[in-house]
Each structure stands twice: as C-alpha cells, then as structure tokens.
Swiss-Prot record:
It catalyses: a uridine in RNA = a pseudouridine in RNA. GO terms for molecular function: RNA binding; rRNA pseudouridine synthase activity. Its EC number is 5.4.99.-. The keyword RNA-binding applies. It is an enzyme of class 5 (isomerase). CDD domains: PseudoU_synth_RsuA_like, S4. This is Uncharacterized RNA pseudouridine synthase aq_1464. It comes from the Bacteria. SMART domains: S4. It comes from Aquifex aeolicus (strain VF5). Residues 4-71 form the S4 RNA-binding domain.
Amino acid sequence: MMEVRINKFLSEAGVASRRKAEKLILEGRVKVNGEVVRSLGVKVNPEVDIVEVDGKPVKPQRKRYIILNKPCCYLTQLGRSPDGRKTIEELIKDIPERVFPVGRLDYNTEGLLILTNDGELANRILHPRYKLPKVYLALVEGKVDQKTLKRMKQGIELEDGFAKPDNIRIVRYEGKNTLLEITFHEGRKHLVKRFLGAFGHKVKRLKRIAIGPIKLGKLSPGKWRELNQGELAQLFKAVGLKYVPRKRR
C-alpha cells in the first residue's frame, strides 16, 4: 500500500475530518510507531506503521462504495443542520464506516449520490479532466417544442460562461409540462436549472439518474446500496484508475 499523509489517513480511518485531524497532530496527540508526530507532512504506510491517537491504535477502515437515492428536501451534508433541516446522514446511519458524499445535490433535487471513504476516487470523480457525464430528468413548466430543443442542443451563454449539454431529449409531455433528459459533464452550481430557465422553462422537479457508468436504477428514495465489483471496475476505469477487488477473508 502506498504511503499517505497522516491527516488523510486519520480522516479516512474515521477518526476525524482532515482539518480536525491536523489539530490532533499539532496538539501532540498522535503517535507513529511509538513516537509523537507534530508535522502535518508526515506520511504513513497503513499496512506497516502503527498509528495511535490518545494512546489508542487506529486501524484503516475498509473502503466503502455506496450509492444513495437522495429524496427531495434533504441537505447533502453530514451532521445536523443549524436550521433543523434534514440531512442525508439520517439515511446512512447504519453504515459503520465514515463515508462522505462525492459532490452534492441541491436541497430540492433528488436522485443519485455516490458516497465513499476513498479520497482518491472521490477527487477524480469531481475533477473536470475526466468529464464524467451526469444525467438528469428535469420536469419543466411549459411544452418544449422541437425548435426550442434544437436551440438547447446548440447551447447558450449564461452569467458564468457558455453552457451546452452533452445530450438532451424530450422523454414525454405531462399535461402542460415537459419531462426532459439532460446530460452535462460540468459541475457548475445550479447548472441544469439555470440552463433550462434561460430558455423560459422553469424546472419544477430535478432528479439525477446517472454519474458516468453508475446508474440509479430502481433504488427507492431514501435507500442506499453497495456498488458491485462490475460497477466499481467501470467507475475506476472511467477516471483512470485500476480497480483491485478486495480479497475476502
């Protein structure tokens, strides 16, 4: 196993957030192989080095790769919300490892969230270099005609730059509304809502159904499941990593 910075190791082992782990180190509460470390630059090999916090040994957590179907009206954050709104932590209480969401969905947006304690994979999923497509179902006000759909495919200038979907299609009409499937590989804030709103079609409901090769499928709202080895192999490959299946003991 490769060496990692001590603060990253402590964070991924579920001891504390990376920032709080740095505080523990600076306070002299962390030992590596029996010696107190106070430098944030120290690296450890989790398979060889013995790491302790306040005299208690710290063991690396097994890597977890989970997808959650986030319902509407949940904040994409761990811990309690200061204003009392529900957070996704309430939905993953039965996961013993400390996992974190990869990216976020707005409070009113539903659908696919990836959660993991694999920092390298998370960083690559979010990095624009890998251009992982995110697929959404958007229910918008009004009927989108073919002329407007063609204009949408050509893109439009928004306040933070030009935006053009990788793909967009009409799924069906629902009364006076239109259900669209729209794909972006960018991760700009409120991009889908702002893009469709620029064409005069306000988003009434938004749901993410895929991130790269990972699809939400029939997972019920508020439920989570582990990614299987086939899905993990595809996801790792999509971001330039090699997936090595965990050996069963």
